């Protein structure tokens, strides 16, 4: 596997990694870096710009956009797998590919419908009129639900100032510098149904495998002669985002596990994920995929066993953990997805919204509960005094919750908003999960800007 670091010598790697870390660490002068921030800053090394020759005639562009783009050279043209987030990034990737980017582009394959993988197709297609290939479910995929206009951007840190943003978990930036509007998307001209489809494109034999998981339509691309597997977003160098903060349904874990079983059986020698660095060496690929499957399955099995015992979501979050050997695995660090989020998502998906406590069938409204608690504790001033004490002692969650009692009754109470914003800021700074960090910090920013 050959690496070309943005067209420069290998020694540029260290310089680039350092620059990326310093760029993201603009906040360092304001406070001492937390352990979580140090972890996320180190994770930035996984996004450095480079063109990697995975196998003969197979190149992947890492770090030039939110998602990877793979170039497969054929006998009379090229096949592109995923197309980056937008035309701006796509043009930069074509330039980085340089002479390796052969024309015409005979086909473009989408692994799934997410904008960061499908937004630059028009640039790669140019005037070549390639076949655009995907699973049929990509065509019928519904837009993400979300909870409002800000939701996706909040988890990705889209509106955070530079001195607070580090990364978005699977990418160095999402929509901060270049758009994620799918403006360069081209609809499929050819789809397949069922479990798989064998193709020969520009003389390259390949098999498209329907591997639902991160998305229902996720398609793995298997190159049997080169022993190269492109997994889409079913495998990443982070615990998977099974139950996203940004307002999406919990992913179908049983299908995800089955899809990983399917691709493990291929015995690939090279593995290209949808984001970050490829993995090479048959033993390394098998170990990485197996650990990924086992990590997901462990959380699933533990959660389902707990549900069967009548445990509540809060109880499950306290008890369900990755086994020690998996918790240390580099492909299961919680930069993007979270074990705790996954546990709550599985519970809601499999057992519904009700936690089994009869008191929670028809609970008081937040405002009603807060009004009674404030009366019981002597009013808003006493509650805020207690919240300030919690904040100063580092009991950040309790500080934020007490501020919420006041805000439930008086949403624009300036002191309560400040206490909550300060608590959320510190909570965010301590996170090594990028989506949690970004959401905390964005919520704090919103409280400060909208008193």
Where are the regions a protein language model picked out?
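Gram-negative bacterial Sec-dependent N-terminal signal peptides
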Residues: 1-28
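Accessory terminal helices/loops
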Residues: 19, 29-41, 265-270, 278-451
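Metallo-beta-lactamase
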Residues: 38, 53, 77-78, 85-87, 140-309
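Conserved beta-strand hairpin/beta-sheet module of binuclear metal-dependent hydrolase folds
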Residues: 48-99, 220-223, 227-233
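Divalent metal-coordination and catalytic microenvironments
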Residues: 57, 72, 82, 97, ...
